[in-house]
Structures are given as structure tokens and as C-alpha cells.
Curated annotation (Swiss-Prot):
GO terms for cellular component: apoplast; plasma membrane. The gene is PROSCOOP8. It comes from the Eukaryota. One of its GO terms (molecular function) is receptor serine/threonine kinase binding. Residues 1-25 form the signal peptide. Its main location: membrane. This is Serine rich endogenous peptide 8. It is found in: Cell membrane; Secreted, Extracellular space, Apoplast. Interacts with MIK2 (via extracellular leucine-rich repeat domain); this interaction triggers the formation of complex between MIK2 and the BAK1/SERK3 and SERK4 coreceptors, and subsequent BAK1 activation by phosphorylation.
């Protein structure tokens, strides 16, 4: 009798998990409207992107980080 109730309990737990997991994963995925601000922020980041020809190689102002001109 205990084996039958244990298997029924296992079946009930499995069915609950089977029904609850897909609903929680769908709600955690971003919808199409929620992904639009991400696109806007990536455009802002790309607007500050510098190509290799625009990178400043002169070093820091304080001189502590290295680079720049070295005084003998």
C-alpha cells in the first residue's frame, strides 16, 4: 500500500513540476517590447566607440600609469 501512495505522490509532484516550469520560463524571458531599450543602449555605446585611428596613445596625465613621454 505504501508503494502505491509513494508512486502516486511522485506522479503528482512530477505533474506539478511539468505544469509550473514552462509557465515560469516563459515569464522570465523578455518580451519583444522589453528588448527595445537594450537595443537603444547598445546604440549609445556604439556611438562612443573609437576606431583604431582615433585611440589616444599619449598616456595618462598623472604619469603614474606609464606610457606617454619618458624623462631621462
Amino acid at each position: 500500500m505504501e508503494e502505491k501512495s509513494a508512486s502516486q505522490l511522485g506522479l503528482v509532484v512530477f505533474l506539478l513540476l511539468f505544469l509550473l516550469v514552462p509557465t515560469h520560463t516563459e515569464s522570465s524571458l523578455p518580451s519583444q517590447q522589453e528588448s527595445l531599450p537594450v537595443i537603444g543602449s547598445s546604440r549609445r555605446l556604439m556611438s562612443t566607440y573609437k576606431t583604431n585611428s582615433n585611440i589616444d596613445f599619449e598616456g595618462s596625465i598623472s604619469g603614474q600609469a606609464g606610457g606617454g613621454q619618458q624623462n631621462p
